[in-house]
């Protein structure tokens, strides 16, 4: 059996089990192209697989482990069916990457990011700065994953009822995200600009487009954000190998919200479940990690605990 046929058969098998199997499918097809789609499965060797795992820069990245596990499962599936004889992968795996500690942006840093989003481009581009700015603002003020604003269609916005719909995001769940009057103003302002560009108002049209009328991609927005962050002079000083990321806007939203609740004397433990639902987490434990993420948050939590202990806050 040829590699391309093995990959497609395995993807079909995983999807027949009810799985979406999207990211691994992209990776496996990339593997087939890398080693040659017409290559016979029996001739796949460990050296070639190892080179693929470390490509393109011969380094260990987060994708290394996804590639390894996906290939391992496919090879084991192929062995049972007689398409291969062994798992041709390195016996030892590299040390797991250090956990990326989220960077929590300050109010001043957020202001610089949003302002520079309109002026970061040095040359003409098909990416409208107004779209980039609106995406970054929505990502922060609503605590979204970057894939979520990019995937929004006009039908997903309900400004009258003040909510938007996130359709089948992470964990394949849809959810409604309510917002306040400030977000209504933000969206109305952007949609007014969008209309002035003569873009389609069909409900199925994506909200954020480039000048070719194509949906903006995650990579385009991520690259734009990196330029904006560098122009804003925002960088880590804690020795971490990773600089502040686009996804940290979402983490900043969560931490800022929790800090605000503590400072106003709210019952954070009770509200944590609501925040978890709002963020689209599949388990509250994924949200509770924010409780110890910054010194400010820990300080506010300690102050509230002391107030309860001394009887200054009613229960």
Model-derived regions: residue spans:
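Conserved catalytic core of the tyrosine transesterase superfamily
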Residues: 1-315
